[in-house]
């Protein structure tokens, strides 16, 4: 266990930040799950709406330093391709 005042403070900060980061990651994963379910069902309108929400959640997590920018970009690119493929398939 930490003994110095500064290391005790850092330990407290880590606990708080870990909780916040875990909540944000969970929110992003839930959004990704909802989008994948909409794509799986073949619901174009719901998939497009959910993609907007998911892209926003990914961008926010990048701004907060939870995800790397390239990781979020990769997710958005692949998911957008799946949504567009679903839209062209339905049309």
Swiss-Prot record:
Leader sequence segment: none
GO terms for cellular component: cytosol; small ribosomal subunit
Pfam (any one): Ribosomal_S20p
Keyword RNA-binding applies: yes
Keyword terms: Ribonucleoprotein, Ribosomal protein, RNA-binding, rRNA-binding
Domain of life: Bacteria
Molecular function as annotated in GO: small ribosomal subunit rRNA binding; structural constituent of ribosome
UniProt-listed InterPro entries: Ribosomal_bS20, Ribosomal_bS20_sf
One biological process term in Gene Ontology: translation
Function noted in UniProt: Binds directly to 16S ribosomal RNA.
HAMAP family, per database record: Ribosomal_bS20
Protein name from the UniProt record: Small ribosomal subunit protein bS20
Native organism: Acidobacterium capsulatum (strain ATCC 51196 / DSM 11244 / BCRC 80197 / JCM 7670 / NBRC 15755 / NCIMB 13165 / 161)
């Amino acid at each position: 266990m930490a003994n110095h005042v500064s290391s005790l403070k850092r330990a407290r900060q880590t606990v708080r930040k870990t909780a916040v980061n875990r909540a944000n990651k969970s929110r992003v994963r839930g959004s990704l799950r909802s989008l994948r379910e909409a794509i799986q069902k073949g619901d174009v309108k719901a998939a497009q709406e959910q993609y907007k929400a998911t892209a926003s959640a990914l961008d926010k997590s990048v701004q907060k330093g939870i995800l790397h920018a390239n990781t979020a970009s990769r997710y958005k690119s692949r998911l957008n391709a799946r949504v567009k493929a679903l839209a062209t398939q339905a049309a």
